[in-house]
Structures are given as structure tokens and as C-alpha cells.
């Protein structure tokens, strides 16, 4: 009988630990790129939404999640809670200037994180 109680307690503890480590959160926002012209004017914005941009969310060098922006530059991704580095795959040197390049995902929360890609146009 003690063995059954012990094994049941152990199974509950393992299940509780597994649930805690898989808590997920959501990031959403818009990726903008710019400047898109050397001189910005009121009639012409300096930045524009960046469609079809892939964002890689990595932890300890391993890709944990990815998101691709829509035509309006918006993205949404669910990830396990924790800290992530963010980068673009095989982007040109200019397009690698992604900011911010580190984010934090909170368990059971949705956070808005907007990214910008510096085109280097000056």
C-alpha cells in the first residue's frame, strides 16, 4: 500500500513540475523597417511595415520558435516562458540590425513587442 501511495505522489509531483516548465506566453506586434528614404518628409513616412519577415526566437543557440510577419508587418508567436534572443535567418548585413534583439516571455501573458529593422539608408 505504501508503494502505491509513494508512486501516486511521485506521479503527481512529476506532472506538476512538467506543467510548470511548459507554461507559455504570447508575443505579438509589428515589424517596421526604415528609414526607407534618405530624407523623411511629413507626406512620406520614414518607416514602413515589413511583410514576410521571419523572426527566430532562440534560447542557448537553439531555435525555440519562429514567426513570419503578414503583409501588414504583424506577427504573433506562442513560446515557453523565459528569455530569448531574436534574429532573422540569413538576412543581409543591413537587415540584421533588428531591435530589440532580446525579449522576455511571461507565462500566461500576451506582450506587445514591436521590432524595427534598420535599413542603413541615411
Listing of model-derived features with the role each one plays in the protein:
Residues 1-4:
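Positively charged n-region of N-terminal signal peptides that target proteins for export
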Residues 10, 14-26, 30-36:
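Beta-strand-rich domain onsets/edges
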Residues 29, 69-77, 115:
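Glycine-centered loop-to-beta-strand initiation motif
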Residues 59-72:
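Short, acidic Ser/Thr/Gly-rich low-complexity loop/linker segments typical of extracellular
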Residues 71, 80-81, 107:
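Surface-exposed loops/turns
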Amino acid at each position: 500500500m505504501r508503494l502505491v501511495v509513494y508512486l501516486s505522489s511521485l506521479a503527481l509531483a512529476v506532472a506538476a513540475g512538467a506543467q510548470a516548465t511548459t507554461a507559455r506566453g504570447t508575443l505579438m506586434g509589428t515589424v517596421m523597417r526604415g528609414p526607407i528614404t534618405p530624407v523623411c518628409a511629413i507626406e512620406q513616412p520614414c518607416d514602413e511595415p515589413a511583410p514576410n519577415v521571419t523572426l527566430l526566437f532562440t534560447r542557448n543557440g537553439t531555435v525555440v520558435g519562429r514567426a513570419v510577419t503578414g503583409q501588414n508587418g504583424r506577427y504573433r508567436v506562442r513560446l515557453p516562458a523565459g528569455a530569448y534572443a531574436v534574429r532573422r535567418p540569413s538576412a543581409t548585413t543591413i537587415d540584421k540590425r533588428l531591435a530589440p534583439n532580446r525579449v522576455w516571455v511571461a507565462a500566461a501573458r500576451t506582450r506587445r513587442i514591436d521590432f524595427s529593422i534598420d535599413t542603413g539608408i541615411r
